[in-house]
């Protein structure tokens, strides 16, 4: 998944960018995931608010905005900044950890370890490449490219290549590009592809060849340029659109391809399409209706709360129907 969220270009972009920066601090430095989720939810709700927010009290009327966040909004609106963020930015350790986690392959724990060793910048990482694993070296190599958002127009071209090459390998494959792209986003952080084949179910033996032959085909046409990791059901790598004539080169982009059993495919598509907030709301509604949903299955809950056998699913709509929830197109799944 992509490391960076798109900067908010909305009526309340300053507020949402502030909340996103706080969220990243809580995740990468404090490792307080509940606070990270709270800031993310508030930022998401405010981003969709159709009016310019004039006070914390106005923001507090929105779901997910509590007293503490409302107070921060008041401070930001009054001064144009936030003391807590100013402090974080001035703290060398916090800002260095936050920065290093932007390198693909470097999580909060690795970032903290590097900072403890005095490695705080890209230049420091380059001087200490022997301390980096394979994924981190690729992340460093393409740092500038991975920082750039992928415009929707490029994502559509990338999707065409992937879907066409997949069908060349075997016309029975089903592939879906998920993430914010499927929800209609104007830009994406990376490309997330789900793949299945009728011959592969949760009852089958493992079939890594189904994933690997697709990866090899995409390498053959020079779309996939680097491999970060290649397992039996998940490939993580780097791809690049081919240049047309003498046009400038396209940036390298992160791509993940997941092979999913056919009977679990649409639960996977639903989950990886998101958004996170939509998925949480849908899972909560499912529980109220006596079902449990995850990225693999939907199962009925018995009177004791124990989940039963997975229900058959042949489309995303089947999942909505089971829990008696009106079907929502991917573009309507922000919350």
UniProtKB/Swiss-Prot annotation:
* Cofactor(s) annotated in UniProt: Mg(2+)
Kindly list the places in or outside the cell where this protein is found, as annotated in its UniProt entry: Nucleus; Cytoplasm
Q: Where does dTTP bind?
A: 149, 180, 183, 189-190
Task: Give the GO terms filed under biological process for this record.
Answer: base-excision repair; base-excision repair, gap-filling; DNA damage response; DNA repair; DNA-templated DNA replication; double-strand break repair via nonhomologous end joining; homeostasis of number of cells; immunoglobulin heavy chain V-D-J recombination
Q: What, per the annotation, is the impact of changing residue 72 to A? A: Severely reduced 5'-dRP lyase activity. Does not affect ssDNA binding. Loss of 5'-dRP lyase activity. Decreased ssDNA binding. No effect on structure shown by circular dichroism
Describe the effect of residue 68 to A: No effect on 5'-dRP lyase activity. Decreased ssDNA binding. Loss of 5'-dRP lyase activity. Decreased ssDNA binding. No effect on structure shown by circular dichroism
**Reported effect, residue 137 to Q:** Decreased function in base-excision repair; decreased DNA-directed DNA polymerase activity; no effect on 5'-dRP lyase activity; no effect on DNA binding; decreased interaction with PCNA
Positions of Mg(2+) 1 binding: 190, 192
For the cross-link Glycyl lysine isopeptide (Lys-Gly) (interchain with G-Cter in ubiquitin), the position is: 41, 61, 81
Location of the active site: 72 (nucleophile)
This protein is called what?
Answer: DNA polymerase beta
Source organism per entry reads Homo sapiens (Human)
